[in-house]
Amino acid sequence: MDFKEQIAAYAAQIGIDKIGFAQATQTWQKDKYEEYLRLGYSCGFENQDIVKRYALSTDDFTAATIIAVAIAFPPYQAPVNEYEARFCAASVGIDYHAVMNEKLNDLGEFLLKLVPGSQYKIAADTGNWSDREIAVLCGLGWIGKNSNLVTKDYGSFVYLGEIIWDVPLEAPLKLVEDHCLNCDLCVRACPMLAIDDKRRMVDTRRCLAYKTLDKNYPTEETIAKIAANGYIYGCDVCQLACPYNQWLDNDKHIFWQENRD
């Protein structure tokens, strides 16, 4: 087996569901991100420094290969309490960052066995870059109209992470075909009318998921929408409307089954 096959086999062995590779020099969607900022859609959580956002290399590290991974999780809906409060599925149970970082470091140590003396760095919602953009470059899925990464096997209920490695691998660009086509179920489902489906962007100034993370969110409109949808932290309404998120079998990892209630 070549390096990519060995890496993919080991990733599956440690509980990673999808893996893909891309050269670190691949073209990113800088123009689209600049448009996103220009439209004022940013919530302020993202790195708005264009240079830093798309820089994988540093003074002491030269990025050569991107390895993107995804771990599926169930679209679990926490039982409502007497106030019918809900949390988004991604926030229920064990902190995924800890699990993902453990898997990524495990995979990184495997890379060092393949190429002793090489270097890698990991990220899972912690890098300057976009996990979703990297996942697209590495062929894990496509960007849905609600701006989430959608995979054919696990829908959009996947946690994303990546390893940046200083060893070059042959990794031609293999983008996954867009399967949203004329579907607009997520767009129509959004309680805040926040989805700009033509641009595949979300106006985070309106998105309920972002508003519930903002300490200044309790406007009358937001409170009314929370009362109608039940979410007090995050929001899964658009994802649950997606055909690719129906009949998922994402509940196979025992580590997601801990501390749910």
Language-model segments: residues:
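Immediate flanking context of iron-sulfur cluster ligation sites
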Residues: 172-181, 224-235
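Iron-sulfur cluster-binding cysteine motifs and their immediate structural context
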Residues: 185-219, 227-258
